[in-house]
Design a protein with these regions (language model features):
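C-terminal helix of von Willebrand factor
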Residues: 130-178
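Alpha-helix termini
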Residues: 2-9, 61-72, 101-108
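P-loop NTP-binding core
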Residues: 28-31, 69-71, 88-94
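Short, flexible, mixed-charge acidic loops at enzyme active sites
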Residues: 28-35, 129
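VWA/integrin I-like adhesion module and closely mimicked acidic/polar interface patches used
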Residues: 85-129, 135
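DG-centered beta-turn motif at the end of beta-strands
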Residues: 17, 56, 72-90
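Von Willebrand factor
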Residues: 1-27, 36-75, 79, 112-125, 139-147
Length: 181
């Protein structure tokens, strides 16, 4: 079921959009899914991946603190990064971004981090960030977003204490769980 047609998911799922090419830009801070903008995003220029990752983590941590201050329970936050290339960020910045991902996953806000690689992305580099790497083989983004939507509906119905995530056995055709080389 689509996240927009599910009453519980529609109330619980919030989305933020961060782009990173030569510059990092917050297209949308966290908003309920029903108010999410649908921007046209194009791959241009360089790929400041470290800057994009760190900005996304910053937004997640800020939102987590807001929930904690309000005493509101919440599911583990997700970052789902879509990339078509190799990072142009300096090595030390990528190493720091990698450390930030691992810290927030293990000790911080419980962050779940996935990568969707398209075209000529850096598989090995993505596995330094996370074990959760999926590959889009036929550029069918609609199927991927439908799959994500179904996963969010499932997670929205679980207890906040359950470790729910993407269901790899339900992936659409043309999307595979990429194995590390």
């Amino acid at each position: 079921r689509n996240v927009m047609t599910d009453e519980i998911a529609r109330k619980r799922v919030e989305i933020a959009i961060v782009t990173f090419n030569s510059e990092v830009e917050v297209i949308s801070d966290f908003v309920p899914i029903e108010r999410m903008p649908t921007p046209e995003i194009r791959a241009t220029g360089n790929t400041d991946m470290a800057g994009g990752i760190n900005k996304a983590i910053e937004l997640v941590k800020q939102r987590t603190r807001e929930y904690q201050c309000l005493g509101t329970s919440f599911h583990k936050p997700w970052i789902f990064m879509i990339t078509d290339g190799v990072s142009n960020s300096p090595i030390d910045e990528m190493l720091q971004a990698t450390r930030n991902i691992h810290f927030e996953h293990k000790q911080g806000c419980g962050l779940k981090f996935w990568v969707l690689g398209v075209a000529d992305y850096d598989v090995d580099g993505m596995y330094q960030l996370t074990d959760e790497v999926v590959e889009l083989q036929n550029e069918d983004f609609t199927a991927v977003f439908d799959w994500l939507s179904e996963s969010m509906v499932s997670v929205s119905k679980t207890s906040i204490f359950e470790d729910a995530g993407l269901k790899y056995d339900d992936m659409p055709d043309g999307v595979i769980k990429k194995e590390e080389y």
